[in-house]
């Protein structure tokens, strides 16, 4: 045995520290490596560049409503492939895949509860479910939310994140635009506030119906909001669109929305606005609220 081989036989390789999958993630905008639990505590907002990442419907509603007050509505409603639609894949297979991936039956989750002790009904889109597309179940759940708000005589808040009407349901999905808008007319007749929160992205038939019908239309920073996408518009008009076209900041400059609110400030802002509209005492910004306990950051960051 040569002297090199003798040295090699005495070398014990160090064991690489194992980090469970999913502990770290990267910001979609700046590429910063982020601790997953800290990002969740910060409501999926990058602490470095303030990029607002997409948030699941349930996490959004749980971050909005008071702990212990949440009651889900319309969970028994499930989509059906009435048309036996098929493109590159059967619609029923797309539904099964989306339901397995997200754990949701469809793209809208509705809950009633309290916000700073004020009764409200809130709805949020699950964009991971077929791009948050609006089908008959989404329309039915939204109408259920309106009916509950009317019954409880309380405000309604909807967080939109959708690519538009669901093409696999054809005319039935387009009918939801009129159905949801007609339901909101009853809120207006009763004088109950409806606040629409536009998140990234809010497009197509959703933006052309209830997403833009709020008594107050609020957007998150840099959210893409419009009907057709920028690429489609450029190809149609054969012109270069201005920078930031269809983003929140562009829309507020043109008067299309009322305000832009950062996600960490959204809960208190909504409570303050609704308290004024409902002639109730202003919420206490220092009121304690139970939150998640975040485990300590691991010593070793993942390799780039």
Curated annotation (Swiss-Prot):
Domain CoA carboxyltransferase N-terminal: 23-292
Phylogenetic placement of the source organism: Bacteria, Pseudomonadati, Pseudomonadota, Gammaproteobacteria, Enterobacterales
Reaction(s) this enzyme catalyzes, per UniProt: N(6)-carboxybiotinyl-L-lysyl-[protein] + acetyl-CoA = N(6)-biotinyl-L-lysyl-[protein] + malonyl-CoA
Organism: Citrobacter koseri (strain ATCC BAA-895 / CDC 4225-83 / SGSC4696)
Gene: accD
Location(s) in or outside the cell: Cytoplasm
InterPro entries per record: AcCoA_carboxyl_beta, Acetyl_CoA_COase_Trfase_b_su, ClpP/crotonase-like_dom_sf, COA_CT_N, Znf-ACC
Protein name: Acetyl-coenzyme A carboxylase carboxyl transferase subunit beta
Zn finger residue spans: C4-type: 27-49
Gene Ontology BP terms: fatty acid biosynthetic process; malonyl-CoA biosynthetic process
């Amino acid at each position: 045995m040569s002297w090199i081989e003798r040295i090699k036989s005495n070398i014990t390789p160090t064991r690489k520290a194992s980090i469970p999958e999913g502990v770290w993630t990267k910001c979609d905008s700046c590429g910063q490596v982020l601790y997953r639990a800290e990002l969740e505590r910060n409501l999926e907002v990058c602490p470095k560049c303030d990029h607002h990442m997409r948030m699941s419907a349930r996490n959004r509603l749980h971050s909005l409503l008071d702990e212990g007050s949440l009651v889900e509505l319309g969970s028994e409603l499930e989509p059906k492939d009435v048309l036996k639609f098929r493109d590159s894949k059967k619609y029923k297979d797309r539904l099964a895949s989306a339901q397995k991936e997200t754990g949701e039956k469809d793209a809208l989750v509705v809950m009633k509860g309290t916000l700073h002790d004020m009764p409200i009904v809130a709805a949020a889109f699950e964009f991971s479910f077929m791009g948050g597309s609006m089908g008959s179940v989404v329309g039915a759940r939204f109408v259920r939310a309106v009916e509950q708000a009317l019954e409880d005589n309380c405000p309604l808040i909807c967080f939109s994140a959708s690519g538009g009407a669901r093409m696999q349901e054809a005319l039935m999905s387009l009918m939801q635009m009129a159905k949801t808008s007609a339901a909101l007319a009853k809120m207006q007749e009763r004088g109950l506030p409806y606040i629409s929160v536009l998140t990234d992205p809010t497009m197509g038939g959703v933006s052309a119906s209830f997403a833009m019908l709020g008594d107050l239309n609020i957007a998150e920073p840099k959210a893409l909001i419009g009907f057709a996408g920028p690429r489609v518009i450029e190809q149609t008009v054969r012109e270069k669109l201005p920078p930031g076209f269809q983003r929140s900041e562009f829309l507020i400059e043109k008067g299309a929305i009322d305000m832009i609110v950062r996600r960490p400030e959204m809960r208190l802002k909504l409570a303050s606005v609704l308290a004024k509209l409902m002639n109730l005492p202003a919420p206490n910004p220092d009121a304690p609220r139970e939150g998640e306990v975040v485990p300590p950051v691991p010593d070793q960051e993942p390799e780039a």
